[in-house]
């Protein structure tokens, strides 16, 4: 586009969107496989919880998801930390606009969530205190509860640590 605007390009590009699509197919080897998946996601975007919402790599991925309109991201984490990382990375993510931040320290659903978690797991050794603590601290558990209670359609977790540590909450 810059070459066309400056007059350096010898052949004008009539359809910039199609041209970019062709270029992306060269860059991404998985484009052939992923294209129909992305098209389906764009047609019906879902609410996806990112359990490690404070992580820089997660935020970079969320920016791509927002830019491509693939889903409505829900980030679990402390708003101050998330917003600081968004600013540091110069991202265009805004709570309440193109993302939602779930602050486990003051979410109004906290009581319902820990009580439900306790009722479901009390026979497995989960005490009331443990339920309260885990629903406040375990981001994968928070994500799973959001999905279970219909507040999200899916979740992504396990970007750090071992997967089996996250899967026990799913």
What positions do the PLM features span?
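Contiguous, glycine/small-aliphatic-enriched amphipathic segments in soluble metabolic enzymes
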Residues: 1-158
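A contiguous, basic/glycine-rich beta-loop/short-helix subdomain that forms a polymer-engagement track
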Residues: 154, 163-170
């Amino acid at each position: 586009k810059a070459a066309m605007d400056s007059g350096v390009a010898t052949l004008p590009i009539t359809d910039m969107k199609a041209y970019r699509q062709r270029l992306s197919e060269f860059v991404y080897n998985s484009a052939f496989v992923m294209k129909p998946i992305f098209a389906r996601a764009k047609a019906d975007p879902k609410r996806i919880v990112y359990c490690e919402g404070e992580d820089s790599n997660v935020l970079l991925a969320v920016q791509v998801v927002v830019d491509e309109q693939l889903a409505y991201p829900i980030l679990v984490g402390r708003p101050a930390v998330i917003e600081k990382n968004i600013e540091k990375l110069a991202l265009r993510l805004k709570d309440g606009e193109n993302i939602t931040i779930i602050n486990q320290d003051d979410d109004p659903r906290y009581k319902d969530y820990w009580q439900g978690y306790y009722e479901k797991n009390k026979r497995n050794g989960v005490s009331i205190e443990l339920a309260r603590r885990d629903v406040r601290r375990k981001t994968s558990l928070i994500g799973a509860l959001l999905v279970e209670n219909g507040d999200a359609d899916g979740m992504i977790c396990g970007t750090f640590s071992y997967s089996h540590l996250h899967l026990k909450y799913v």
